[in-house]
Amino acid sequence: MPAAGDAKTAVVLLDTRQHTPDHEHAVHLKLADGLAQLLGCAHVHLDPPSTPSDRYYYLPTETLIDPQRHAALGIRTEQDLFGGLVAFPYMATKAISHPLPAAASFPPGWTDAFALQASDALLRGYTVFSKADARNAAHLLLLDGPLRIKPVLACAGRGQQVIDTLDALEPLLADMDDQDLAVWGLVLEEDLSEVQTFSVGQVRVAGLTCSYHGTQQLTHDHQGT
């Protein structure tokens, strides 16, 4: 079986979403072309599943969950994909950014470790995995002012709501599936009226390391949101 460091034969776009918007798909294809140039291999988009012996380098459209499952494709280390691979669903979302409220329920594998380490760079908030815990967290946060409800599977600010009373939380919770909430979680965070969000990160591919920083900006999509 090829080792993780063996030369890759192709870059494969691994689209795990039910629906990917056309503009995002175009970006993924462009990124796959660039990765293929860096790795010195072809760019292909295969529908049939591959095997470890194919020695592909994968570009997933979202963070992959369950290392054992994706090992069947040959994805075992960072040298096998441009993206993330985590053990539990909540690790793939913003749920890791905040601790639980006291005595809250939590899914398998949960840890507050990252939230505690990053607390100096984050707003005050909580992650919850049940509606009862959401009410408790909201009560605590509302003591200091309005709070923001942040669905963890949404991106670019979509689906977020600001509330200033507990009563305003109830219709939002009513629309949430209890099972999905127990798996993925929900973030409740203090709300800021004027925000400047900085981003930092680092990527590694083909023996190269690239670090970046910048300031986030929001734009309107085709729905005007």
Where are these regions (language model features)?
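Active-site nucleotide/adenylate-binding loops and adjacent lid/helix of ATP-dependent enzymes
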Residues: I96-V187, S193, V203-L208, G214-T225
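Short beta-strand scaffold segments in enzyme catalytic cores
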Residues: F198-Q202
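Short helix-terminating capping/connector loops at secondary-structure junctions
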Residues: G5-D6, S50-P52, L181-A182
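Short, surface-exposed beta-strand/loop "edge" segments at domain boundaries and coil↔beta transitions
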Residues: Q18-E24, T63-A71, H222
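Conserved N-proximal alpha/beta basic substrate-recognition cap immediately N-terminal to
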Residues: L29, D33-D144
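Short, glycine/charged-enriched secondary-structure capping and boundary segments
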Residues: A26, A72-L73, V162-D164
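Short hydrophobic beta-strand segments
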Residues: P2-E24, D54-P60
